[in-house]
A protein has these predicted regions:
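Flexible, membrane-associating and regulatory peripheral segments of lipid-active enzymes
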Residues: 1-198
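Serine-dependent carboxylesterase/thioesterase catalytic core
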Residues: 2-9, 19-32, 189, 216, ...
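C-terminal catalytic-base region of ester-bond hydrolases, centering on the histidine
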Residues: 32, 98-106, 134-137, 348-445
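N-terminal topogenic membrane-targeting module
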Residues: 158-183, 192-194, 201-204, 208-211, ...
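Active-site catalytic motif of lipid deacylating hydrolases and related acyltransferases
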Residues: 177-249
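Hydrophobic/aromatic beta-strand patches that form the interior of the parallel beta-sheet core
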Residues: 186, 217, 277-279, 355-357, ...
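Short aromatic-enriched loop/helix-cap "lid" or pocket-rim segments at secondary-structure transitions
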Residues: 199-200, 288-294, 365-370
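A Trp-anchored, charged/polar loop motif used as the substrate-binding/catalytic surface
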Residues: 326-345, 434-444
Length: 445
């Protein structure tokens, strides 16, 4: 924390403690209200709100709430100790006066706490449902509530600090347009998801790339269908982007099954001359061994029921001919082995720059459902994995980058595309993609 920040925090802490313990002064001289009311207003409305480094109102409000809670906790502890000591002096002889002291302090800190907690609960992107729920459950449990509050304060202060630093980085390099590649970027989603304006599959990544000069487009293909069907869709989408932008080619960044779909589009659908580069992210190029087994042991009627339900739902969301079972079978190790024989030489001979990225989780606790369960299944079959795909299946192209865990959390199949917009310790996913696209730019692509 910088010196200015420490000074402001100490200033707010003093104001908060003064107000919380000011009942005797107000009782003796009502004119102290002229100090109390402005101090109360400053604490509840202006702490942390005015910051030029905060890129949005949401983060300014989050910072306000986090600082308010950070001030509340030590100040409230001082107030509790003060009133316990006071109780020994005033009870039983002057218990009514002590009660008024305590009620005044309780009312003051009640407002401060709820102001802070409501602000962070409504605006923090990093608290998550689990941490919010634990906070609500433990709120009335002594000692546990203090630990929960400390955790909430740490999470939200870390969030606003991180976002402020990112804003500073982006402002400093805004003129460089480090992601302004020669050819536009095409982001291709994986299986069981669709491109949507409401929910962005790629989280905060597209906005970060665009802010740094990139032109970003989406695949807009089926959520689940065969590699061949999706490949045809993507080939048409590539032609559409080329016509729309006037660019000669596109740079493709594809996640999961999207990597297989793009390889097929390049090799089989006549768009090899329209693709400058292909970057696959956690794609199962050698398939998933556990998928072969699951499709064998799960009864056909169960598979058909799941597929029918999924396909029906996806038709309502815009897919014309979803095919869940074929999509799943195209992720098996046996199918991908056959596919590789067809596609590898075809993609390589067109002179397209090819690279791949993979990541692995540290443990089953590294991600939520269903990746936490699949991590254990995949580990039994194939060893280290990202919750869905084994590390043995990622590598493709001239360059391979394996993102290994620097902490026990690791990086999951969803973390690597920022799907849930949760920051991963020691891995800035947005900056990773900025560097990825910057490298394409430096290669003249």
């Amino acid at each position: 924390m910088k010196k200015t920040g420490i000074f402001l925090y100490a200033f707010y802490l003093i104001i908060c403690t003064f107000c919380g313990l000011s009942f005797p002064l107000l009782r003796e001289n009502i004119n102290y209200l002229y100090l109390f009311i402005p101090a109360f207003i400053v604490l509840n409305l202006f702490v942390g709100v005015f910051s030029a480094k905060m890129p949005s109102l949401r983060l300014r409000v989050c910072r306000h709430g986090a600082l308010l809670l950070a001030v509340f906790l030590p100040s409230a502890c001082v107030a509790v100790i003060h009133h316990v000591v006071l109780a020994f002096k005033m009870i039983p002889g002057d218990w009514k006066n002590w009660l008024w002291h305590a009620l005044f302090a309780f009312g003051f800190y009640f407002v401060i706490f709820w102001n802070g907690i409501i602000c962070v609960y409504l605006t923090s992107a990093q608290l998550g449902i689990r941490q919010r729920a634990i906070g609500l459950i433990c709120g009335l449990i002594p000692v546990a509530n203090v630990f929960c509050l400390v955790s909430i304060i740490k999470t939200t202060l870390r969030e606003v600090k991180f976002e402020a630093e990112k804003e500073e980085i982006n402002r400093a390099r805004s003129d460089e347009r480090v992601c302004a590649t020669k050819y536009p970027i095409l982001l291709v989603h994986g299986v069981c998801f669709r491109d949507s304006k409401i929910f962005n599959y790629w989280g905060r990544i597209p906005r970060e790339l665009e802010r740094n000069g990139a032109r970003v487009f989406y695949g807009n293909h089926h959520s689940a269908s065969s590699v061949a069907f999706c490949g045809e869709e993507l080939a048409e989408r590539i032609r559409e982007i080329v016509r729309e932008t006037g660019a000669e080619k596109v740079n493709i960044i594809a996640h999961s099954k999207g990597g297989l779909d793009c390889r097929y589009a390049i090799a089989k659908c006549g768009v090899s001359d329209l693709v400058a580069s292909l970057t696959t992210i956690n794609s199962p190029h050698r398939g998933c061994q556990y998928a072969d087994t699951l499709l064998t042991v799960i009864p056909n009627q169960v598979q058909d029921k799941v597929a029918t339900t999924y396909n029906k739902a996806m038709r309502h969301l815009g897919d014309i001919s979803p095919d869940f079972l074929t999509a799943m079978s195209n992720l098996t190790a046996s199918y991908c082995a056959e596919l590789a024989l067809e596609l590898d030489d075809a993609v390589e001979k067109h002179g397209i720059y090819r690279q791949s990225v993979g990541s692995i989780m540290g443990s089953a606790k590294s991600a939520g459902f269903p990746l936490n369960y699949f991590y254990l299944i995949v580990k039994d079959f194939d060893g280290p994995n990202d919750g869905l795909v084994s590390d043995k299946s990622f590598e493709f192209g001239e360059k391979f980058t394996l993102l290994t865990p620097k902490t026990r959390r690791g990086i999951s199949h969803m973390d690597v595309i920022d799907m849930v917009k949760m920051d991963v310790p020691d891995f800035d996913v947005r900056e990773f993609y900025v560097d990825l696209v910057r490298d394409l730019r430096e290669r003249g692509l």
